[in-house]
Structure formats: C-alpha cells, structure tokens
Amino acid sequence: MSNVDISNDGFIGLDYDSRNYLQPQSWPVAVDHQASHRAEGARDISPLQTSGHAFEQSVAQDPNLMVDWQFQHMQPHLQYSHEEASSAPQFTTASYGMPIHSSPIDLISGTPQGPLSGSLLDGPYLPLSAPVDMVPFPYQDLQSDLMAFPSDGLAHGLPEIPSYAAPQNVIDSSSPADTYLEVRSLTSSSSDNGWSTIEPRRSHEYFPDQGFFINPTQTLHDRSLSESSYSTSYGSFVEISNPVNSPSSDTNFDAAFNNTMTRRVSFDHTSHGSQSPTAVSPVAIVRPIPVPMKKPSSPTRSTGSSSSTSPPTRKPSRKSPIAAKTAETKVRKQSQNGKPETEKRVGKRKGPLKPDQRKQASEIRKLRACLRCKFLKKTCDKGEPCAGCQPSHARLWQVPCTRIDIKEIGYFMKDWKADYERHISLGFSVGNIKGFSEHERTLFITHGYGQILPINAREVYVHNDQCFNVDWVETYNRGPTKYEVETAKLSAGMEGISHAMLSDYLDRHIDGNGTFEKFVDDYFEGTPFLTQMLKTAFRFYYRTKMPVIRKALKLIVAYNLTLHITLVEGLGEEDGLLGKVDVEGSKFKGKTLAPVMINFQIKCAMANMWRELQKDVLEELSSLYSSVYSGEKLKNWPTIFILASILLAVWEEMQFDCHYRTRDPAAVEKFCNDMETTPVGVIVGLFQAISQKLPAFTEWETQKHHHLLHSNPDVCSAMTEVRQHVTQYESYLRSRSSSKFNPKDFDCLSNKFVSRLVVRAN
C-alpha cells in the first residue's frame, strides 16, 4: 500500500489507478472487554452507501479525522477512554444534494469506562485523537501488518481470532457498523426508501476497472430508520459476518451476552462508476406482502430480527400477493363445503326463490307466520286461516290460526281498568282537593293475611268531604252482603307507594311459613279444584325454586289483593281514626279500614304490579313453547302446565270482575270474546298439541311413565297430586266449560278455562 498517495486530508488523488492497488484484505479486531453499562440507550445510525452516484462532494477538514488508522492489540487487562462525539464538526453539503451527517468517528461514546477489575494493571489505550507521529502502525502499512495475523478460517478466506477461555461480556458502542448490521437484517416490512445489500462474492482476484478510490469511512452517514429494531432493545444483535468495523466499534453490545464474541471485519470498495453487485437500488425492490397466517395479529418477522441465536439470512422469495389470495380463497371454499352430510337442513328449498315465491315470502314477513307454521317450520300464506291450519290439514292441531306471538296475547286487556276504577269518583278530582298537611305519620297497611306494608300518610283538605266512604261485599257462608264505612281523610305521603316495598310485601305472602296456603284457604274459601291446584303449584315451586313459577304465584296474589279492601293495623285505643267496622256479621268486625284515598292508591300500584308479572309469565310461556318444537320436547312440559293453569285461573277471575264491575254489557261481551277466542285458545290448544305422547292425568303412574318426564322426582310427585285432584273433580271439571256468569255466585266462572286445559289433555 506504499504506492497509494494519501493526502493530509485523508483523500486519495484522482489520478489513482486501481490496477496497481493490492487486493483488499480484511483485518480482524478482537473483542475482549468486560461488559459495562451502555453509555447510550439507543442508536439510530447506519451507513448510507453512496456508490453509484457520480457526484463530487467536498468535505470540510475535520481535525479529529485520522489520516492514518491506529491499531493495537486490545488486551483484557487494559482500560481505555473514548472521545467526545459532541466535539466533532459536521460534514458540509457543498455539492451533494442530500444532507450528510456526522462522521462515524465522531459518534464514538465519550463516557469513560471504569476499571474492569481492581487487580488489573493500569494502562489505557491510546486515544483516537492522538498525534499522528505516535501511531506505531501508519495507514500505509495496514495491509502488510494485518496479513501477519494467524488465520484458521481458510475455508472462507477470512481470518479469525480464537476466543479466550474466560467468557467475557461485550462492551457498549455507538459504532455505525452495529446499526449497519441491523439494516442488513431488516425484513420485507422495512421502508421502500431504504437500501438493501447483497453479499459480495468471496473471490476478489479480479476487480473491475476503477477510476479512483474513495475511503469507505468517509461515506458513512446517519440514517433515521423507523424500523422497530431501532429501539432500546438489542435482542436482535447476533454474530454477523462482513461488517464495517473500527477499533472502537465493539462496545455497543448489550451486557446480556456473557460469552466472548469474535468479529470479522472487511472493507468492500466500490468506485462510483462501476457496476457493483453490492448495492441495489431501492426502487427496484418490491416489498412482498406477507401471507396471513392462522394468527393474523402477530406480524411476520425475519429470522435475523426475531432470533438472537441464528445469523440473519435473507428468506427465499415469497409467493406473489395474487397467489396468496388465490390460495386463501381456495381454503375458504373448502371450509364452506366441508360441512357434514348428516347435518339436518331446515326446509326443502335448494335454490333461489322464484319471483312469485319471493313476493309471497315478502308478504308473509310483513304479516308474520301463524303459530303453527312458525313452530312446525311450515310455509304460511295470507289466508284467514292459512292453508296449514285448515281442519282437513290440522287434524289434532286445535290452535287458532293467529299471527300474534304468545307474549303478546294479553292484548285484550288494553284499557281495561275494572280491577281498580270502581272507586274513582268526583271526590278524587283535583278540583275537590284544597291541599295537604305537611305533617306525615306512618300507617301499617294490611290485607288481613298476616303481612304489613308501612306507608307514610298525611291529611288532605277537600271541599266536599262526602267521598271518603268504602263499600265492599262479603259472601262468607251466605249470600252476598254489602257493607259501607266512612274512613279518615288521609292520603299517601309525598313519596307515594313504594314499588320496591310493595313487591317485598307480595313476596312475603309466598316466602312466609304457610302464608301462601293460608291465603288460598282464606281468600278462595274452598273453591273446588282451583284451591288444590294452587297448593300443588306452590309445593312444586318450594321443591324446585323455579323463578318463573314464583312469578306466577306472585301474579295470582297481586291480582286478588288488587280487588281486596285494605286495613290498618297497630292503632291504639286512643287513636280516633275513622274506619272501624262495627257491623255485625262481617268477618272484618273490630278492624279499621284504611282511608279510601290510600286504598285507591294501593290498588293502582298493585294493578301495575300484576300487569307486569303477567307480561313476564307470557314471555316465559312463549319461550317454553318454542323450546318444545326446538328439540327439548317434553323437558319443560311440567312448567308449562303449572304456568298455564295459574294464568287461566287469573283470566277466569278477570271475566267475573268484568261482569261484576262493568255496567256496559257490550263492553263486557267484547272483553270476554276477545279473551276466549285467541288467548285462551292458544294456551289450551298448544298444551293439547304438546301432550299427545303423554298419558291422561287420570292414567298417570309414576312407575310406568316416569321416563317420559326424565324421571324427575319433583315432577312425578306433582303429577301424582294432579292425578288425585282430577280424579276427585273429574265430573265437575267436565261441566265447567259451559258455565255462565252469576252475580250471586263468586265461583260461577271458576275452573272454566282450567277445566279445558285438564280435560283436553286427557
């Protein structure tokens, strides 16, 4: 290399002839320093190759730029210091079109390293900025001196330095060569504006004709990359061949590497005017689209950036995006066509609908299919009734052809207020009330069945005080007898009737020890069959704790207490509250009736309560009936029977109260017809349809038929009780379907609908 004329500024003259230049050889630098904490937590530098650009660039004189490289064997027992990178001036861009960043020499960490061990000798390395005359190896003798190193890597033509016995950690560095290694390990997800390099051929016997020589250390520039590998994590650093290195570039490795690492260093010189395989234009590189794997959330990474044990190698070329999409489409089609052949298909249609069929389907969607076609998954039509519900086709199907869902069959109750509006009079109008007292007192309200409802009451001032009388009718062991008592001028407080307290009041009628059975005995006064059925339903709930059965029991309590008078408990003898019953023959003798306004307010709150409960019960019935035709068959049959029995018992009482309290015969007739035609027919007809495979109630035997109801002991016990009730009142039940209203008989309409449910099931 003595024939190479290097000027004082580190550049080679333009008259340099590469044919007289020796073959470029690589020189090794050993890495054998104890690990220390990184001086810099992140690095974002990488070499920018300028080969292939035929432009001049003038570089300002750098006082810290070495004319001759200085090298020394790095002994493990010596320490050395770094040069401050901030003191280095920046390159200028006199004639080059892009900004040129600082010199790699200036990027060397300036943080001094502490002594590696207390027992090691003191002897720092020569600083990089030392005078030129102190360098023992000038740049001209670099070629010959490096050739003297022993080489055992003859297979690849690169010298190697044997590792030391004791494992050593790698020291941090800010050399651009380390970032250059990561640039070479970038995946296809890198920016299209970056440079990609290709491994040079190992044989350098014949170099292309070169016009002039450029020092590679002066063509390294900073690059700002957004790749995720340029973060504070150094897990992607591995042993890599052919990096551009310098004597102080082996200190930027993480301390996690505890073993000695050998580095191979080589320079690849390329002229500006030659066609070199080491540089590839980024425009010609097309970034492949990774094929989506089973886990699309995890990005595809190259082995060079994701693995810390294997050297970074370029993956073979992937398939084109078109091929990837085609393969993905094929897999999707196979997954769609891979259905089991034994899967049950709903319907028989194999192709698209015809125009007339499409029009018919659109009309049916607007009208909704009838219950039969909905449950049996048949094609419905616009007929009234539809073709499927005709007598010649329905056979055992006795459900009315209706398009109303079960949860909506309570439509007949719209605007029905006969359960509480009887006590509404002009006395409750706003014009009759002058005001309310600010003082409130607590009254303990009851219906006479052992439970108490506390309510805040206040005095009300009215113009006409002749509207506070309460009348009721009793039929206990005799004909109907009417009573009337004047009550106190009190109303509920500012908060009114609490919905939560009222619900808890109803719950205590069910949860108390024997309270529900006592309520049934006292209120229904021995109504045949209905009394026994309600007690059986309560015992079934007590054993199963089914919430829907509880709602049904709460429904019948709430409805009957809505039409019941209210009493006041806990009054002393000195409390002169009006409303005490002194009439002989009344079962309420000696008790005090609640003020009429509070009685009405409780009725309104109770009426809203049982209407909500009935809505919930109808929704449960709708889902239970649907489950029968969805594959569960008779699993929910006992629950359906209990719910239907209680619901029909409430509707029977509603018919009687409508006759008894409504003075308009036409309105009463319409209400009863609306109830019996569709709602009662749907409940009874559907129960008949799902009971075809079960024996009659009078023929039920647990030992013989228990398997039909999944051998449930609670269900079998309830069925045994129902069989006893039906057997006891069979003749009575068969005569109840034709019963008529009688104002003197409160049980005249009892079991009218329940008998249809039981007898038709037989």
From Swiss-Prot:
Effect of residue 373 to A: Decreases conidia production and increases kojic acid production
Region Disordered: start-end pairs: 267-361
Transmembrane segments: none
Null allele phenotype: Leads to longer aerial hyphae and to decreased conidia production. Decreases transcriptional levels of the central development pathway genes brlA, abaA, and wetA during conidiation. Leads to increased expression of kojR and kojA and a subsequent 6-fold increase of kojic acid production.
Impact noted for substituting residue 386 to A: Decreases conidia production and increases kojic acid production
Stored InterPro entries: Fungal_sec-metab_reg_TF, Zn2Cys6_DnaBD
Any one GO CC term of the record: nucleus
Protein's UniProt keywords contain Transcription regulation: yes
Record GO terms (molecular function): DNA binding; DNA-binding transcription factor activity, RNA polymerase II-specific; zinc ion binding
Keyword line: DNA-binding, Metal-binding, Nucleus, Transcription, Transcription regulation, Zinc
Record's subcellular location: Nucleus
Substitution effect: residue 380 to A: Decreases conidia production and increases kojic acid production
UniProt entry tagged with the keyword Transcription: yes
PANTHER family found in the cross-reference section: ZN(II)2CYS6 TRANSCRIPTION FACTOR (EUROFUNG), ZN(II)2CYS6 TRANSCRIPTION FACTOR (EUROFUNG)-RELATED-RELATED
Chain's role: Transcription factor that regulates conidiation as well as kojic acid production, likely by negatively controlling kojR and kojA expression.
Name of the protein described by the UniProt record: Transcription factor kpeA
Gene responsible for this protein: kpeA
